[in-house]
Amino acid sequence: MAKEVAGLIKLQIKGGAANPSPPVGPALGSKGINIMEFCKQFNARTQDKAGKILPVIITYYADKSFDFVIKTPPVAIQLLEVAKVKSGSAEPNRKKVAELTWEQIRTIAQDKMVDLNCFTVDAAMRMVAGTARSMGIAVKGEFPVNN
């Protein structure tokens, strides 16, 4: 018989750096989940992604056991890394903080494709480019048309 799902918790944690302090401790402790067990498992699975912010979806069950799925880093974080800037623009319509090429956008879109709700790389590229524009990061040239 399948376990009864009691709920979901969504967090963003740095890879390899989960510890019982906030936000992890209070979020898991209030649901009765073993915090140290989660931290050990998460840190073991994210050693290769140390320092990167990773979204994690934790499914916890009525018997206090849990499973979790680690997603790819958010698009905004990836854009900041590729553009080599610390933050987006406070006025994205007026002040641009960086400029990316469509090839860089394609790389991010292909990396994030598994987590996005789109079917083609072109659609994913448009989503990533929209996020970049809203952060004050310009995209060079026109959208490449594949023939």
UniProtKB/Swiss-Prot annotation:
InterPro entries: Ribosomal_uL11, Ribosomal_uL11_bac-typ, Ribosomal_uL11_C, Ribosomal_uL11_C_sf, Ribosomal_uL11_CS, Ribosomal_uL11_N, Ribosomal_uL11_N_sf. One of its GO terms (molecular function) is structural constituent of ribosome. One or more lysine residues are methylated. Keywords: Methylation, Ribonucleoprotein, Ribosomal protein, RNA-binding, rRNA-binding. It comes from the Bacteria. One of its GO terms (biological process) is translation. Forms part of the ribosomal stalk which helps the ribosome interact with GTP-bound translation factors. Belongs to the universal ribosomal protein uL11 family. HAMAP family: Ribosomal_uL11. This is Large ribosomal subunit protein uL11. The lineage of its organism: Bacteria, Pseudomonadati, Bacteroidota, Bacteroidia, Bacteroidales.
